[in-house]
Amino acid sequence: MVPSQEEPAAAERETNEAQPPGPAPSDDAPLPVPGPSDVSDGSVEKVEVELTRSTGNQEPPEPPEGGWGWLVMLAAMWCNGSVFGIQNAYGVLFVSMLETFGAKDDDNMAFKAAWVGSLSMGMIFFCCPIVSVFTDMFGCRRTAVLGAAVGFVGLMSSSFVSSIEPLYFTYGVVFACGCSFAYQPSLVILGHYFKKRLGLVNGIVTAGSSVFTILLPLLLGNLTSTVGLCYTLRILCIFMFVLFLAGFTYRPLVPSSKEKESEDSRSSFFSRRKLSPPKKIFNFALFKETAYAVWAAGIPLALFGYFVPYVHLMNHVKERFKDVNNKEVLFMCIGVTSGVGRLLFGRIADYLPGVKKVYLQVLSFFFIGLTSMMIPLCSVFGALIALCLIMGLFDGCFISIMAPIAFELVGPQDASQAIGFLLGFMSIPMTVGPPVAGLLHDKLGSYDLAFYLAGIPPFIGGAVLCLIPWIHSKKQREISKNTGGEKMEKMLANQSSLLSSSSGIFKKESDSII
């Protein structure tokens, strides 16, 4: 049916009658701006919904797989090296602390000195849940730069102490907290720049600590014997200053929550009228993912004896092999094979689909526990070197695939807090293990029982991790089943709507015929 000319004319007359009397609006006249009273609450909500759809739910950008990301990788590599190289070489500082602050009548000196290193390592991981919140709110760059500055202050203040007790705060708390704030953003930022090569890049980055673990024991051994403990700590401050500069390379691709809020406030015309509810700081919904909850429980369970060799191995060699002068070569062996393991197993992880990467961590915990229990059985120094080579290889395997597994379990958006929670849980066993080993040494006169006990938890934790692929696959089957059921319901609903509409058409046709 073609519309007649009379219908537009009638519509025009109705429009003119509805308008109030007054001058006709010209084309040059400015359009009226609606005030607060001219806009209803329903329209406000509609505008906010549309703005949220257009700005709030954008997909994260695709990782560029290179470019500036290579510089970010090098900066993250320096971060891992400077933070964990110093921590892994604490055995050298441990011996120097015994000589500098130890007294002949103090029978618990090994216990006290072990607390400094274990507290430092534990605080690095304990602060990670808090660091994850800072990373989400302020971004990787600001968090890393702040952490490096705090670490510099803590390490510098540690060089001016005259007894071991102040080191609990300056080295064990301040320096460690700064390292934690600098370390975790280096893991998170890599997932923004890489996806296909994430396993390899994580292997390269975490290999930084292996390189530093090779070099720092020799450097610290020479420095402590020539300039003393205090000046050695001041020289280590240079590493923190370089880390401070490296943090500026973490250019964000995914905006932080503060940046998202500022964008929303700029783009929303009615942002001042209605405020969104405050965002939850800690994302505890992660633990509803059963596979992640098991992972976050199994790894800390395996790490009760993990840090014991790094703290007490040097003193064990000093007591057991008194004629050996190059004790630092053991840390060099751990560092070399740890770097190889990070690169090798990081690349292997890229070929393992999904959460099956967890099996590599199970394998690594088995060999870490076995080598720890075999340390007291070594009667020659060469056998101890062989054990350290094996331990370093599988230590690199465990560390390099931690971030890729987190991305597989919870996705890139929640990976920051997932890693933060895990590292926070890891702080408890890593803090407790070395002091207990030092206490056993002070009471029994040797480290034999301490190393035997340190090898048991990795077997238990590895057994728990074996459940993760089964749990994850079961969850995926349930999701696919529910998705299939929803699709079937939609298909049936569409068919019923088609049938009802067709029956209505037939009814109208029959009525018209009648």
Curated annotation (Swiss-Prot):
Residues 1-65, 135-143, 192-199, 249-290, 350, 417-418, 472-514 are cytoplasmic. One of its GO terms (cellular component) is plasma membrane. The modification Phosphoserine is found at residues 262, 497, 500, 502-503. PROSITE patterns: MFS (PS50850). SUPFAM superfamilies: MFS general substrate transporter (SSF103473). The chain crosses the membrane at residues 66-86, 114-134, 144-164, 171-191, 200-220, 228-248, 291-311, 329-349, 351-371, 396-416, 419-439, 451-471. Residues 1-64 are annotated as: Disordered. InterPro entries: MFS, MFS_dom, MFS_trans_sf, Proton-linked_MCT. Keywords: Cell membrane, Membrane, Phosphoprotein, Transmembrane, Transmembrane helix, Transport. Not N-glycosylated. It holds the Pfam family MFS_1. GO terms for biological process: aromatic amino acid transport; thyroid hormone generation; thyroid hormone transport; thyroid-stimulating hormone secretion. Residues 87-113, 165-170, 221-227, 312-328, 372-395, 440-450 are extracellular. The keyword Endoplasmic reticulum does not apply. Belongs to the major facilitator superfamily. Monocarboxylate porter (TC 2.A.1.13) family. Sodium- and proton-independent thyroid hormones and aromatic acids transporter. Mediates both uptake and efflux of 3,5,3'-triiodothyronine (T3) and 3,5,3',5'-tetraiodothyronine (T4) with high affinity, suggesting a role in the homeostasis of thyroid hormone levels. Plays an important role in homeostasis of aromatic amino acids. This is Monocarboxylate transporter 10. It comes from Rattus norvegicus (Rat).
